[in-house]
Amino acid sequence: MVLMILPFIGSVSVSESLVALTTVCLVYLILKFFRTEIPEGLHRLPGPKPLPLIGNVLEVGNKPYLSLTAMSKRYGDVFRFRLGMRPSGCLSGSETVRKALIKQGDEFAGRPDLYSFRFINDGKSLAFSTDKAGVWRALRKLAYSALRSFSSLEESTPRDSCVLEEHSAKEGEYLYSNMLNAVMKVTGSFDPFRHIVVSVANVICGMCFGRRYGHNDQELLSLVNLSDPFGQVVGSGNPADFIPVLQFLPSTTMKNFMDINARFNKFVQKIVSEHYTTYDKDNIRDITDSLIDHCEDRKLDENANVQMSDEKIVGIVNDLFGAGFDTISTALSWSVMYLVAYPEIEERLYQELKENVGLDRTPLLCDRPNLPFLEAFILEIFRHSSFLPFTIPHCTSKDTSLNGYFIPKDTCVFINQWQINHDPELWKDPSSFNPDRFLSADGTELNKLEGEKVMVFGLGKRRCIGEVIARNGVFLFLAIIVQKLHFKTLPGEPLDMTPEYGLTMKHKRCHLRATMRASE
């Protein structure tokens, strides 16, 4: 039968071929869907009916965190939908997500084989990789071991705290005393995101590479400016991820995405190569050195099951650098917006710092127990902004079930963190910004049980490996900023806090005024 159609191939146009191929794929998927056998005692996932070829893309829209939240109200905490030709599922509700990612962690620990993911760190990314479970776990363990050996997370007075504090103090001082003050004197306003993102990137560079860049260094600026388009593609998905035939058609978006990743890789590869040249096992200078050290040890270990290649080192460092500065800088940028929107909260934070830390020294991580309102403010920023609306998509590693519903192997699973953080069954008046919800009744202590309900870094086996550094970095930078600066809007310009969807949701860029606290 196949041989009979070969003579006609040369007379068929490209468009006709694509239509034919799409039709075949569509028929196959429809037949596959209706032939899916549901094990006895389980139910088929509920969800909206998909359109041919595009699935439920139109219903998901450009604000999927809102549309999928609306669908969860209709279909429940576990439902299916289709993005193009890819069967997908969405998990909402704190109990459901915790059950999936913790109790059934192995079954939901995979990553979908999305076309765009193959180009992130040349396919060597620890966060986006589809490596088999054993390989991925071994590499994650090595990465965490390298991070721990550099940061000594297990000690009561962590070495990473000292390093993080050192870099944060230097960058915080440069941020408020040099950059912001100089900019304010010249222009009368400043773009908070522009300066925060470079300062944070320098802290991450110090941790990963042991070096600092000037705030006008063009190489660093060009790289940090790539985080937005990267997040937009990963967050919204590339059409080729969900309609496979599009992989073979030219795409400006995909070309730009590949260029972004190539530039990131080139930057990190250069630094890793330099570290190999100057590496001294008796002088581990930073996270890159620590990863090289673990890599060398495993090369010498004949019994090691998984060898970590040089490319994997680049991928891990790239993950830590990219995710670290983007997460912290986005959180801090939102923090400044909330400080401006709620001046009475800004004043409470300043008074807490003034009374418990003073104004003559830089805040330290050991001050955290004495700054419960600042801790509550950070948690409420994480919850209210939900600037990480979804985790990186998960994938089922085998046929499984959840809440009585059958979920087939290789289902792309979205974890709706935004829904959890705005669930009225979990939070009183979730739309209001209220840091006091995380304090004890007398307002003197942080309510840690309430804080644990906030979903921001994922859960379980795929939980963000850099969570500790991210939380500590946000705390240190924000404490320094509140201690030294007071923010205001420009006269006649309203504050626009409308989020723009992406892997991390940003607010619209704006200009603000700032005054030094010491000069007030």
Curated annotation (Swiss-Prot):
Keyword Transferase part of the UniProt annotation: no
Q: Which GO terms describe its biological process?
A: hormone biosynthetic process; progesterone metabolic process
Function comment: Cytochromes P450 are a group of heme-thiolate monooxygenases. In liver microsomes, this enzyme is involved in an NADPH-dependent electron transport pathway. It oxidizes a variety of structurally unrelated compounds, including steroids, fatty acids, and xenobiotics.
Q: Which organism is it from?
A: Dicentrarchus labrax (European seabass)
PANTHER family for the chain: CYTOCHROME P450 1A (PTHR24289:SF21), STEROID 17-ALPHA-HYDROXYLASE/17,20 LYASE (PTHR24289)
Entry's SUPFAM superfamilies?
Cytochrome P450
**Broad class of enzyme this protein falls into:** oxidoreductase
UniProt KW keywords: Endoplasmic reticulum, Heme, Iron, Membrane, Metal-binding, Microsome, Monooxygenase, Oxidoreductase
Q: How does it sit in the membrane?
A: Peripheral membrane protein
Q: Which Pfam families match?
A: p450 (PF00067)
Q: Which cofactor does it need?
A: heme
State the taxonomy lineage: Eukaryota, Metazoa, Chordata, Craniata, Vertebrata
Q: Report residues binding heme.
A: 464
Protein name, as recorded:
Cytochrome P450 1A1
List the CDD domains hit by this protein, alphabetically. Answer: CYP1A
Q: Cite the GO molecular-function annotations of the record.
A: heme binding; iron ion binding; steroid 17-alpha-monooxygenase activity
Positions bound to substrate:
230
Q: Which GO terms describe its cellular component?
A: endoplasmic reticulum membrane
EC identifiers of the protein: 1.14.14.1
Extract the InterPro entries matched here: Cyt_P450, Cyt_P450_CS, Cyt_P450_E_grp-I, Cyt_P450_E_grp-I_CYP1, Cyt_P450_sf
Report the PROSITE patterns cross-referenced here. CYTOCHROME_P450
Family the UniProt entry places it in = Belongs to the cytochrome P450 family.
Q: What is the annotated localization of this protein?
A: Endoplasmic reticulum membrane; Microsome membrane
**Can you state which reaction this protein catalyses?**
an organic molecule + reduced [NADPH--hemoprotein reductase] + O2 = an alcohol + oxidized [NADPH--hemoprotein reductase] + H2O + H(+)
